[in-house]
Amino acid sequence: MANQVLVNVKTSKGTWENTFQKSTRIKDVILGSRMHFRLPKEANLVLCRQELPHADFDPDRALVNYNVIDGEVLILKEA
C-alpha cells in the first residue's frame, strides 16, 4: 500500500518485522516494539536508522518525516 511501510525493528532480543502506516508516530512504533519484545516500561527507548545509530528519531514525529522506506532496518535501543 502507498500509505504503509514495512519496517524491521532490531533490538538485542531480535528483529520484529511489521507494517505501519507512514503517519505512525515514532513513539507508537517504540510502544509496539516494547510490547512485542516485552521490554520494561521504565526503559528509556529511542529509535534510529541502522546506518545512523547516533541520530535518534524525535518520538513525536512520524515515520514519513524520516522518509523510512519499505524493508528498512531501524534500531531500538536504550537512550
Where are these regions (language model features)?
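Ubiquitin system architectures
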Residues: M1-A79
